[in-house]
Design a protein with these regions (language model features):
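Walker B beta-strand of ABC/ABC-like P-loop ATPase nucleotide-binding domains
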Residues: 198
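Active-site-proximal or metal-binding-adjacent scaffold patches in catalytic folds
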Residues: 1-195, 205-246
């Protein structure tokens, strides 16, 4: 039976990459499955019943692709520990410093107008992004509801409640009960882009669907919305840092 050590010898990975590679046997698997994730690393899932030579041949053919995936995971994990953070929506930026803690997982982030000090627990690579996301959520709670309220008053469009959420695919939403949800990662977008999303949800207070009437209402509220929409579609693919997404 093929083991993790067997494939490690075949791939000849460096010590840093070995930690990102694993092999698992599954009763449900009928073929070799390759999984790549910043959280779990690169995983090879093998059927419990398999021919060793068949596995070795397939893995050998994919050696360069596997190495490429592992390299991407390694680089993505490095982005979990940024040296600086900018919130374009508000125009503020901070230099980020780290302080080691080994006995337990600390939860306090120290902030000055120009610096963030993040307690780092080295045994958990995801501890830093967890703290940074908590900090980002607090900044979003401070800014986005007030900004939405100001725009709401300006346009005479009134909502019921606003919630700041962690959302992977939606930047915002508006319900039939006039409740608005906003993605905290809007703080990482330029002001015109985050304002576009807020105007988009305010327009839904008039027209819930995306019919032509909705876009006409949005253009009334924000005449240049098309430029910001194009920018949003471009930036959302690569602008949000890994620490805010994981």
């Amino acid at each position: 039976m093929i083991t993790q050590d067997t494939l490690l010898k075949l791939l000849d990975l460096c010590k840093e990459d070995i930690e990102l590679f694993s092999v698992r046997h599954s009763n449900k698997a009928r073929r070799i499955i390759f999984k790549s994730s910043i959280r779990t690393g690169f995983e090879v899932v093998l059927p419990v019943l398999h021919e060793d030579n068949w596995v070795l041949e397939i893995v050998a053919k994919r050696k360069s692709k596997i190495e490429s995936h592992i390299s991407e995971i390694r680089e993505s994990r490095r982005e979990l520990k940024p040296q600086s953070i900018e919130l374009p929506t508000t125009g503020h930026s901070w230099r980020v410093t780290y302080k080691d803690f080994n006995d337990k997982k600390p939860v306090v982030t120290t902030e000055t107008p120009t610096t963030l000090q993040i307690p780092e627990y080295r045994e958990d690579v995801f501890h830093v992004p967890t703290l940074l996301q908590k900090w980002l959520h607090e900044r979003a709670l401070e800014y986005l509801p007030k900004r939405l309220e100001n725009l709401s008053t300006t346009h005479g469009l009134y909502y019921n409640k606003v919630r700041i959420k962690r959302q992977k695919t939606l930047w915002g939403s508006c319900s039939s009960k006039r409740n608005i949800n906003l993605n905290r990662n809007l703080m990482l977008m330029p002001l015109d882009v985050s304002d576009y999303v807020l105007h988009h949800e305010l327009a839904h207070l008039k027209v819930l669907n995306h019919s032509s009437g909705f876009w006409e209402e949005l253009e009334r509220l924000l005449p240049n919305y098309k430029d910001s929409l194009i920018k949003l579609k471009y930036l959302q693919k690569k602008h949000i840092p890994q620490w805010a997404l994981i």
